Swiss-Prot record:
Gene3D superfamilies: Calponin-like domain (1.10.418.10). It is found in: Nucleus. This is Spermatogenesis-associated protein 4. Residues 49-155 form the Calponin-homology (CH) domain. PANTHER family: SPERMATOGENESIS-ASSOCIATED 4-RELATED, SPERMATOGENESIS-ASSOCIATED PROTEIN 4. It comes from Homo sapiens (Human). The gene is SPATA4. One of its GO terms (biological process) is regulation of cytoskeleton organization. Highly expressed in testis, the expression is observed precisely in seminiferous tubules. May play a role in apoptosis regulation. Keywords: Nucleus.
Length: 305
């Protein structure tokens, strides 16, 4: 009996051990998860970019060496533009001849090679866009990328730019509140970059740019005073006050003064003999033998009885 009890206890212990062991009970063990499959992950779109979705998808599908995070900065040296053209024309353009740098010399050298290639292929890119892209003008690199997209894919896209690009931050300043807008000196510093002064040290050109920015700032101030008269404490003129206080019927009425043809208003109406008379006076001037006559009206006042 004791041996039978020991055998039963040994069997129960082995059964419990078998139940707890994960290798011998695969149906009770948790399923082992494999490694996640690798999938193609596209980089996020650059922040505050005004490129259309079709252009962004086109850039993502080119498999560039690095995806642009800042459009103004990453396209200014022309390296990514050269890489895009190398993908479409691998036998006519070598990427090894371009340098991915940030200095002004590197930018000018890269764009000079690109301009030679574009002239050889008879591609037309406006020089204003190239100049604005080199000097990181706001909104200009997006237009240049769209032009390159149209040249290479022969597809037309609808630009999503809010307004026309004038190579200044005028539209950005107009969206700011009045307190946050820049002054004249700050506007000149923001819109004339140091790279522009180094690439074109002509003083006359830079003075003309500064004068244009000053005039643009004056127009911006005048427009701000018109749109926000309460902020600048602008008092209405007498004419504006009069128009505001006119009644509704009188202000909506238009008075057209029409003069009938053939009707003459007499300047000096004829008065009877008892009204007035004229007397001729001869005046002789010294040194002259001619006489001038003057008409002097004399009124005859009749006394009433």
């Amino acid at each position: 009996m004791a041996a039978a009890g020991q055998e039963k206890g040994y069997l129960t212990q082995t059964a419990a051990a078998l139940d707890k062991s994960p290798s011998l009970s695969p149906q009770l063990a948790a399923p082992i998860r494999g490694r996640p499959k690798k999938c193609l992950v596209y980089p996020h779109a650059p922040k505050s970019s005004r490129l259309s979705r079709s252009v962004l998808r086109w850039l993502q599908g080119l498999d560039l060496s690095f995806f642009p995070r800042n459009i103004n900065r990453d396209f200014s040296n022309g390296f990514l533009i050269a890489e895009i053209f190398c993908i479409y024309y691998p036998w006519e353009l070598e990427l090894s001849s371009f340098e991915n740098g940030t200095s002004l010399k590197v930018k000018l050298d890269n764009w000079a090679q690109l301009e030679k290639f574009l002239a050889r292929k008879k591609f037309k890119l406006p020089k204003e866009l190239i100049h604005g892209t080199i000097h990181c003008k706001a909104g200009v690199p997006e237009i240049l990328i769209e032009e390159v997209y149209t040249l290479l894919t022969h597809r037309e896209i609808k630009s999503i730019q809010d307004d026309f690009v004038n190579f200044t931050d005028y539209s950005y300043q107009m969206r700011l509140p009045l307190v946050s807008r820049s002054t004249v000196s700050k506007s000149i510093k923001d819109n004339i970059r140091l790279s522009e002064l180094l690439s074109n040290p002509n003083m006359l050109t830079n003075e003309l740019k500064a004068e244009f920015l000053i005039l643009l700032h004056m127009l911006q101030r005048k427009l701000g005073r018109k749109l926000n008269p309460e902020w600048f404490d602008v008092k209405p003129t007498v004419g504006e006050v009069t128009l505001n206080h006119l009644p509704a019927q009188a202000s909506g009425r238009r008075y057209n003064l029409k003069v009938k043809r053939g009707r003459v208003v007499p300047v000096l109406p004829n008065i009877g003999s008892g009204g007035s008379s004229h007397r001729e006076i001869h005046v002789k001037q010294a040194g002259q033998h001619s006489y001038y006559s003057a008409m002097k009206p004399i009124r005859n006042m009749d006394k009433k009885p």
